[in-house]
C-alpha cells in the first residue's frame, strides 16, 4: 500500500506547477518501508529493477491514470540504486530515474554562486556531462531565483515541461537536475513559470552551442578543453612589439561564389590564415562570434554569450580556426559585447519574470540607440556571468585578447540620453560606477588568470585612465582605440588638398595626448558603413588622386605611433561600403575590373606591414616620448609633415608626408643626425601605381641649419605621398 500523495499534489505535477519535485518523486523513507514514486506521463506500467542484482523488486501502482506511479517496498529501510522498466503499451525501456540522485551542486559552488563571486560559473551552470553512481548523463543548472518552477525540456522528453521539473537551491537561486542518458547534440531549453505565473521558454544563458536562427534552442555540447597561453603568443601581445590587426567579419570576408552562402570555420581557416600571413598582419580581430539572432547586428547584439555562432559550423571548428592562426604565428582577438543585449523572448530579458539581468527602470536598463537592454552591473551574479565569459573565450578557445565594444555607453549613465532620461549615480554624477568596477574587475581577472592576454577598449571619450592598471585606479585595459586620431585624420583626408592647410592641426593634435594611453589606430568597420563611404570613397579628387591620397594616408598611419587596425577590404581599397550580406569585392584585384590600382594598395599594405615588423623604431617606443620627434610640424601652406621614429637601440626612421598633389622638390628640413638616409618606402612608387617621384634611393645630410637643427637634408617629396627614410649613419 502506498503512502497517500494528495490528488492536489499530483495535479500540480500534471499542471506543471509543482516547485519541489524531489520532496515527492524518487525514493522516500516511510513507516512501512521505502517508497518509490515516479512521474511518467502516458506510461502504462512501471517495474523497479535493482541495479546491482538486475532483479525486479516490485511493480509500481498506477496511482493516477495520467502517469503517476508509486509503491512501498515493505521491510526495506535502506536506499538502493535502481532503474525503472517503463512500459509504453507492449514496448518497454529501462531508464534511470533522475529523482533518485542526491543534489550535485557542491556547497562551495553554491556559496560562491550565491554571492556572485564564482571565478568560472560556466563550469557549474548550464549543461555539463558527468557521471553519478556509475550513470552517465548531463547535469543541467540554471540561475532563476524568482521562478516558481523550472523544468528542462528538449529532444529527450518531447519538450514536455511536466516530465522533468528541477530541484531548487534556495541559497543561490539555482535550479538543478541530473538527466541520465541525455546526449551530445540534443536540443534543450528551460521552461519556467515566472514570478507572475506566466510560462516562459528560455535558452540556456551558459549554453556552449546554440541553434542557427531563426531557431532558438540550446544544444548539449562539451565544455572545450583549456588552451594554455604560449610564450610566443604572450610576447606578440606586448606593448613593445609590432601589432597590426586585420579586422574580419566572418560572414562576408569571402563567400561561396555559387550560392553566396557562408564558408564554414574550416574553409575560412584554409583561405583566411594564409592570406593574413602573406599580408604581414600580426593579429586577426573577429567581429563578435557569440550567437546572435539578427544578422544585421553583425554580432553586436548577442544572446548566446558562451556559444560560438553556428552560422559557420561548430565550436570545434572555431577552435580549429584559432589553432591554424596560431600555427601561422598570428594572434587572435575577439570583439566582446558586455554592454547590452537584445530583448528577444528566448533570451535574458525578464528572465524569471523580474529584471534579472537588466535594470528594471528603462532610464538605466534600456538602450534607445540600439533598442536593446543594458546589463545591471550592480548585481553580483550578472557581473560574474559577464567577466567569466571573457575568461571562457580566452582560456577555452585560446584567444589572445578581447576588444570590448562600446565602453563609453557602459561607463556613462547619460550616454546618448537627454536631460531627465537618465538616473545619476549615488553621488549625483553621470558615471556608471558599477560598470566601471565591472570593467576593472574583468581586466584584473584577465591579468590574473590568462597572463599575456590583452584587452582593448573601444572608448570614444576622454575618460582618464582607460589603460592605466586597475590596481592604480584605472580601468585596466591594455590598449584603447584612438578614436580622436581616427576622426581627426579622416576629416582632414576628406578635404580637398586646397583646404587642408586650414586644418593642419587635425593631423598633429593626436601627439598632444599620445602618451596618456596605450593606443591602437583604428580604421574599423564603423568607418565604411551607414553612408560614410569606403575609405577610398572618402578621398577627394579623380581616380589617381583618390588612390594616391589613400596610399599616403596609410603610409602616415603606419609611421605614426600606435598599433594598427585595418578592416577587411580596406587593404585593397574596396570602392563601395562594406555589405555584411556579400563577399568583399575580390574581383577588383583582377586586371579587367580594377586595373592595377587595387593591387597597388594591397601591395603597399603588405609592404607596410613587413617594414613595420622589421623596424623596431616603428613600434618599440609607441608609448614613450623618446620614440618620436617632430621635424616638420607647422608647414601648413605645403601640407607637409615630417617626424622621426626611434627605437631603444638607436634605429631611426624619418616619415615624410605631402598631402597636396604638388611634388615638393628640393624640400629642406632639419634632421637630428648627420649621415645618409635610405628611402625604404615610397607610396608614390610605380610598384603601387604611383608617379614614381623619389630620391633615387637615398639622401645625405648637409651642415646647413634648418628647423633649429644643425644638419638638414634636401628631399623630393612626391605628390600625395609618404616616404620613409632610414638613417644609415655617416
Curated annotation (Swiss-Prot):
Alphabetically ordered keywords of this record? Carbohydrate metabolism, Glycogen biosynthesis, Glycogen metabolism, Glycosyltransferase, Transferase
Q: Please, one GO biological process term?
A: glycogen biosynthetic process
Residue stretches spanning the membrane: none
E.C. number, please?
2.4.1.18
So, what pathway does this thing act in? Answer: Glycan biosynthesis; glycogen biosynthesis
Q: Name one GO molecular function term.
A: cation binding
- Give the positions the UniProt entry annotates as the active site: 405 (nucleophile), 458 (proton donor)
Name the family the entry cites. Belongs to the glycosyl hydrolase 13 family. GlgB subfamily.
UniProt-listed NCBIfam families: branching_enzym, PRK05402.1, PRK12313.1
User: Which function does this protein serve?
Assistant: Catalyzes the formation of the alpha-1,6-glucosidic linkages in glycogen by scission of a 1,4-alpha-linked oligosaccharide from growing alpha-1,4-glucan chains and the subsequent attachment of the oligosaccharide to the alpha-1,6 position.
> How the protein assembles, per its UniProt entry?
Monomer.
What is the protein name stated in its UniProt record? Answer: 1,4-alpha-glucan branching enzyme GlgB
Q: What is the species of this protein? A: Pasteurella multocida (strain Pm70)
Amino acid at each position: 500500500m502506498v503512502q497517500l500523495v494528495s490528488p492536489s499534489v499530483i495535479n500540480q505535477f500534471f499542471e506543471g506547477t509543482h516547485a519541489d519535485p524531489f520532496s515527492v518523486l524518487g525514493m522516500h523513507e516511510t513507516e512501512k518501508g521505502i517508497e518509490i514514486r515516479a512521474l511518467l506521463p502516458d506510461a502504462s506500467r512501471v517495474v523497479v529493477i535493482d541495479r546491482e542484482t538486475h532483479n525486479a523488486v516490485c511493480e509500481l501502482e498506477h496511482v493516477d491514470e495520467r502517469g503517476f506511479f508509486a509503491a512501498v517496498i515493505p521491510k526495506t529501510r535502506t536506499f538502493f540504486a535502481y532503474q525503472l522498466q517503463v512500459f509504453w503499451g507492449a514496448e518497454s525501456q529501462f531508464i534511470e530515474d533522475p529523482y533518485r540522485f542526491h543534489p550535485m551542486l557542491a556547497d562551495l559552488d553554491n556559496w560562491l554562486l550565491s554571492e556572485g563571486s564564482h571565478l568560472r560559473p560556466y563550469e557549474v551552470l548550464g549543461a555539463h556531462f558527468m557521471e553519478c553512481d556509475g550513470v552517465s548523463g548531463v547535469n543541467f543548472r540554471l540561475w532563476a531565483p524568482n521562478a516558481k518552477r523550472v523544468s528542462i525540456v528538449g529532444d529527450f522528453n518531447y519538450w514536455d515541461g511536466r516530465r522533468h521539473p528541477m530541484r531548487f537551491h534556495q541559497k543561490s537561486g539555482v535550479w538543478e537536475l541530473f538527466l541520465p542518458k541525455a546526449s551530445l547534440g540534443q536540443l534543450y531549453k528551460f521552461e519556467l513559470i515566472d514570478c507572475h505565473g506566466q510560462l516562459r521558454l528560455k535558452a540556456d544563458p551558459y549554453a556552449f552551442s546554440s541553434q542557427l536562427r531563426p531557431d532558438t534552442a540550446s544544444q548539449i555540447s562539451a565544455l572545450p578543453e583549456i588552451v594554455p597561453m604560449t610564450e610566443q603568443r604572450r610576447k606578440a601581445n606586448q606593448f613593445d612589439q609590432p601589432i597590426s590587426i586585420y579586422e574580419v567579419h566572418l560572414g562576408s570576408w569571402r563567400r561561396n561564389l555559387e550560392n553566396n552562402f557562408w564558408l564554414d570555420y574550416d574553409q575560412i581557416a584554409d583561405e583566411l590564415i594564409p592570406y593574413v600571413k602573406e599580408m604581414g598582419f600580426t593579429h586577426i580581430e573577429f567581429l563578435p562570434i557569440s550567437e546572435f539572432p539578427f544578422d544585421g547586428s553583425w554580432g553586436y547584439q548577442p544572446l548566446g554569450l558562451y556559444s560560438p555562432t553556428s552560422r559557420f559550423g561548430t565550436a570545434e571548428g572555431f577552435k580549429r580556426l584559432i589553432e591554424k592562426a596560431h600555427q601561422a604565428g598570428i594572434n587572435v582577438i575577439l570583439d566582446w559585447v558586455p554592454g547590452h543585449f537584445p530583448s528577444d523572448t528566448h533570451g535574458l530579458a525578464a528572465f524569471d519574470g523580474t529584471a534579472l539581468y537588466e535594470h528594471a527602470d528603462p532610464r538605466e536598463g534600456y538602450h534607445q540607440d540600439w533598442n536593446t537592454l543594458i546589463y545591471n552591473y550592480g548585481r553580483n551574479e550578472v557581473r560574474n556571468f559577464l567577466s567569466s565569459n571573457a575568461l571562457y573565450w580566452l582560456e577555452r578557445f585560446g584567444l589572445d585578447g578581447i576588444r570590448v565594444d562600446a565602453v563609453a555607453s557602459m561607463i556613462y549613465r547619460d550616454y546618448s540620453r537627454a536631460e531627465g532620461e537618465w538616473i545619476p549615480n549615488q553621488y549625483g554624477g553621470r558615471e556608471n560606477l558599477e560598470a566601471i568596477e565591472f570593467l576593472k574587475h574583468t581586466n584584473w581577472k584577465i591579468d590574473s588568470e590568462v597572463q599575456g592576454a590583452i584587452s582593448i577598449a573601444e572608448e570614444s571619450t576622454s575618460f582618464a585612465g582607460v589603460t592605466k592598471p586597475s590596481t592604480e585606479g584605472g580601468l585596466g585595459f591594455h590598449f584603447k582605440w584612438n578614436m580622436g586620431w581616427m576622426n581627426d585624420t579622416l576629416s582632414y583626408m576628406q578635404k580637398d588638398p586646397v583646404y587642408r592647410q586650414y586644418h593642419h592641426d587635425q593631423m598633429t593634435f593626436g601627439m598632444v595626448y599620445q602618451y596618456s594611453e596605450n593606443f591602437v589606430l583604428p580604421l574599423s568597420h564603423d568607418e565604411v558603413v551607414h553612408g560614410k563611404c569606403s575609405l577610398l570613397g572618402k578621398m577627394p579628387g579623380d581616380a589617381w588622386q583618390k588612390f594616391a591620397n589613400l596610399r599616403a594616408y596609410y603610409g602616415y598611419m603606419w609611421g605614426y605611433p600606435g598599433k594598427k587596425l585595418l578592416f577587411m577590404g580596406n587593404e585593397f581599397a574596396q570602392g563601395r561600403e562594406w555589405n555584411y550580406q556579400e563577399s568583399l569585392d575580390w574581383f577588383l584585384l583582377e586586371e579587367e575590373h580594377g586595373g592595377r590600382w587595387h593591387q597597388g594598395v594591397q601591395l603597399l599594405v603588405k609592404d607596410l606591414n613587413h617594414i613595420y615588423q622589421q623596424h623596431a623604431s616603428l613600434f618599440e617606443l609607441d608609448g614613450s616620448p623618446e620614440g618620436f620627434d617632430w621635424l616638420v610640424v607647422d608647414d601648413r601652406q605645403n601640407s607637409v609633415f615630417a617626424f622621426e621614429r626611434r627605437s631603444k637601440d638607436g634605429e631611426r626612421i624619418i616619415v615624410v608626408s605631402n598631402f597636396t598633389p604638388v611634388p615638393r622638390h628640393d624640400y629642406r628640413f632639419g634632421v637630428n643626425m648627420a649621415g645618409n638616409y635610405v628611402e625604404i618606402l615610397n607610396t608614390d612608387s610605380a610598384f603601387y601605381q604611383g608617379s614614381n617621384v623619389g630620391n633615387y634611393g637615398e639622401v645625405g645630410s648637409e651642415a646647413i641649419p634648418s628647423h633649429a637643427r644643425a644638419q638638414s637634408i634636401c628631399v623630393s617629396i612626391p605628390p600625395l605621398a609618404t616616404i620613409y627614410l632610414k638613417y644609415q649613419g655617416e
